[in-house]
A protein has these predicted regions:
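Short, surface-exposed acidic
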Residues: 27-29, 158-169, 219-227
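AMP-forming adenylation/ATP pyrophosphatase catalytic core
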Residues: 101, 208-214
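A charge-rich, low-complexity, intrinsically flexible signal that marks solvent-exposed coils, linkers
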Residues: 218-253
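Short, flexible, mixed-charge glycine/proline-rich loop motifs
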Residues: 162-166, 174-180, 239-247
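Iron-sulfur (Fe-S) cluster-binding segments and ferredoxin-like electron-carrier domains
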Residues: 179-210
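ATP-dependent adenylation/nucleotidyltransferase module used to activate substrates
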Residues: 1-162, 188
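Short cysteine-rich clusters marking metal-coordination/redox-active sites
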Residues: 172, 182-185, 251
Length: 254
């Protein structure tokens, strides 16, 4: 979707991945729906030049500024209408696969299981032949690490290069003019920590080198966990609030 997002580099990256998959022998039809005129009316840091993209941990309260009102309801509605059109035209059943995941549950209500259950029921009630359509949400209870581990298996099975596939993606909400990820938005931090968890360097380009953005993300995670426990002045080692452990003690913001 083109909806006036500041990170519309994701559209170019998607085209690059489609081209790569095509070169590997996979036939994929790619369509872009332009919603920029309508959604320019919405209030969100993702679409408004008057609002800054917040930085820090992806579950911090200020990340709510990145919510686009009713976005996934709009996206899902268009997808459902298109899927139903394909089902009727081709006389087949259609699954709508979405990558919503548990890492978004805290900040984005329209990524939660109950939202998709409710909106699926509404679409069923509001359409003829709705039995032909279903939602496939494989990561609704998983996080970005789950997605990456699954992607490693899928790329191997499909004979695809994992690094090429993920170099052709964008997660950052505030990439620079060259399309390089900032490493500072909540979405960046979540992605960086997921790659760290699987022991791989993120192939996407950042404004800083990988070691720097990784350390920044780990620091953001640490700050979040310490402050969440009301321990802003509590000494800690490297295990969040486990102050009884041996190690180097320091202030979280020093």
């Amino acid at each position: 979707y083109e909806y006036g997002q500041k990170h519309n580099i994701e559209l170019q990256r998607a085209k690059q991945n489609i081209a790569y998959l095509s070169d590997c022998g996979y036939e994929i039809e790619h369509k872009v729906a332009d919603l920029s005129s309508a959604m320019s009316l919405f209030h969100s840091a993702l679409t408004s030049d008057e609002m800054e993209i917040p930085e820090g941990h992806y579950e911090e309260e200020q990340m709510k500024a990145t919510v686009v009102p009713n976005r996934n309801a709009i996206f899902s509605s268009i997808l459902y209408g298109y899927a139903l059109s394909v089902a009727l035209r081709e006389e087949c059943d259609v699954k709508i696969a979405l990558g919503v995941h548990s890492g978004d549950h805290a900040i984005y209500p329209d990524c939660r299981p109950e939202f998709y259950s409710a909106i699926g029921d509404a679409f069923d009630l509001g359409n003829w032949d709705s039995e032909k359509i279903s939602f496939h949400l494989p990561y609704i209870d998983g996080d970005k690490e789950t997605i990456l581990r699954d992607s490693l298996k899928s790329c191997k099975k499909l004979n695809l290069d994992f690094d090429i596939v993920f170099a052709n993606t964008n997660t950052s909400y505030n990439p620079d003019s060259k399309g390089r990820s900032s490493g500072t938005s909540g979405a960046d931090v979540e992605r960086i920590l997921a790659f760290y968890a699987i022991g791989r360097k993120d192939p996407v380009e950042y404004v800083k080198d990988w070691e720097e953005v990784l350390q920044d993300a780990l620091q953001a995670q640490l700050v979040y966990h310490v402050t969440r426990e009301n321990g802003t002045e509590r000494a800690f080692s490297g295990k969040f609030d486990k102050h009884f452990e041996n190690g180097e003690y320091r202030c979280v913001n020093c």
